[in-house]
Amino acid sequence: MTGVQTCALPIFIRDNPDAFDTALKRRGLPAQAKNLLAIDERRRAAIAKSEQAQARRNAASKEIGQAKAKKDEAAAQALMAEVNELKATLPQLEAEAKAAEDELNTVLATIPNAPLAEVPEGADEHGNVEHHRHGAKRDYAFTLKQHFELGEALGMMDFETAAKISGARFVVLKGPLARLERALGQFFLDVHTGEHGYTEVNPPLLVSDDTMFGTAQLPKFAEDQFSALSGREPREVAIDALNVAIQEARKTDVDPIDDEARFRSFYDSAWNSVPKQVRRWLIPTAEVSLTNLVREQIVEEGALPMRLTAYTPCYRSEAGAAGKDTTGMIRQHQFTKVELVSITRPEDSDAEHERMTQCAEEVLKRLDLPYRTMLLCTGDMGFSSRKTYDIEVWLPGQGRYREISSCS
């Protein structure tokens, strides 16, 4: 069949509609199985009709030759009429199949991952459960300052200059503090690659729509991302190209503007010469690039687990951060982060998740930072997650634990 790419409804949903709806309910979402099954049935029916019409057209085309060989002109003419009718019908059938396909994909793209049974139910962060903690909070005999107060007082953290350069929620780190950030990143990488079995990767920071979709950043979280378009607006480039072409033509020929057909030809040529603008997304986390290293690939079982790490800048617009704490270096638009990604067999996923969390905790233990590990509830964990641990470090200046790592 031509013109229709199929995307079947996940087998789990078709075979377990009640369990699927129960998982959505735990996420605080309405049932979707009945709607998805109905859309998929329309899609499959439309594809079947299109395939049947295509098969009949192919068969009739062969029969035309057979009829002509028998000198049965009437039969040949009738078959040719049938082929033409089928040829005219096929685009509509393919369009119906694609419409159902697009509808199915649109709905599926809005559905989060199903939480594991041990994930607690809850509406927001208040439903999270402390899993364990490590290290004792220290007492100090003096008034504590917050990180940004210390950084600014020492001349190593400059929010004002960063705001002039880029706007709010950026920072310039200077001197020993800039070196400390770099050293911490290198320390994390050395531990994870040298002791935990991860392979360091230096991935692209600008990625495509498909790459963002593959890690569930799109379409749901588009407003939380930064994107960049290459080149100028196509219309501006086309106008410039058209003006150049007209000026060149005027040197040797009549003015093409006086001839509507020639002007249209010049315009079409100018427009077709314009390079198309390409959108790329700045990664919100290196997880996006690392996970997509194996997208649409078949990985040999013997190569698993595949453990990857990267130290990269990350970019987030955090459009939904209104009303949340953005003090100092909290919820910056740009920050650096060491990412861990493991590609495993499905049956090894839970154990690998626990191991990854322990790897993240290990660097905090070596830095002697008190922390606690929280098991997120269904209403607070990420869209693509089945189970998430947040590791929260104790910040003495704020007198509270703050998230420093999220392991899903």
Descriptions of predicted regions:
Residues 25-29, 65-72:
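Short, flexible helix-adjacent loops and helix caps
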Residues 13, 39, 112, 311, ...:
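A residue-level signal for conserved active-site and pocket-lining positions in enzyme catalytic cores
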Residues 14-40:
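Short, charge-rich amphipathic alpha-helices with coiled-coil/heptad character
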Residues 2-9:
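Short, small-residue-biased leader/transition segments that mark boundaries at the very start
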Residues 132-408:
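TRNA-recognition modules of translation machinery and tRNA-sensing kinases, especially anticodon-binding
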Residues 16, 35-38, 42-56, 63, ...:
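Charged, solvent-exposed faces of alpha-helical coiled-coils
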Residues 67-170:
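Phosphate/adenylate-binding "loop-and-lid" substructures adjacent to NTP/NAD/dNTP-binding pockets
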Residues 21, 47, 54, 61, ...:
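Structural signal for well-ordered, non-membrane alpha-helices
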